[in-house]
Amino acid sequence: MKMTKLTTLLLTATLGLASGAALAAESNAQSSNGQANSAANAGQVAPDARQNVAPNDVNNNDINTNGNTNSTMQHPDGSTMNHDGMTKDEEHKNTMCKDGRCPDINKKVETGNGVNNDVNTKTDGTTQ
């Protein structure tokens, strides 16, 4: 049987589309973001999924249980965060370090009063 190039191309395209349609018909995805939905069903973070579920072994009744309807994040003792007594430079350094951009993480500083050989230690307490 002799086939022309056009016939071969049409046959290949038809088989490809038919097999793709058969695979799509077998899946039980209800939307076009099936991978995200599967990830959410498995407990993974999937922002584009139709439904995000709590991680395994987490009771939804234990989330946000302090009874405060205020949208401000609170410390475990219920107090808000304040920077009383901090200079602008200390606040800036604190913010930078929280973002993972601590400007002087390896700088040796005096972490105490200098009596207990603490002058030559790093900010994390090590001496190397």
Swiss-Prot record:
Pfam families: YbgS (PF13985). Residues 71-82, 113-128 have a biased composition (Polar residues). Residues 85-110 have a biased composition (Basic and acidic residues). Residues 24-128 are annotated as: Disordered. Residues 24-44, 52-70 have a biased composition (Low complexity). The keyword Glycosyltransferase does not apply. Residues 1-24 form the signal peptide. Keywords: Signal. This is Uncharacterized protein YbgS. It comes from Salmonella typhimurium (strain LT2 / SGSC1412 / ATCC 700720).
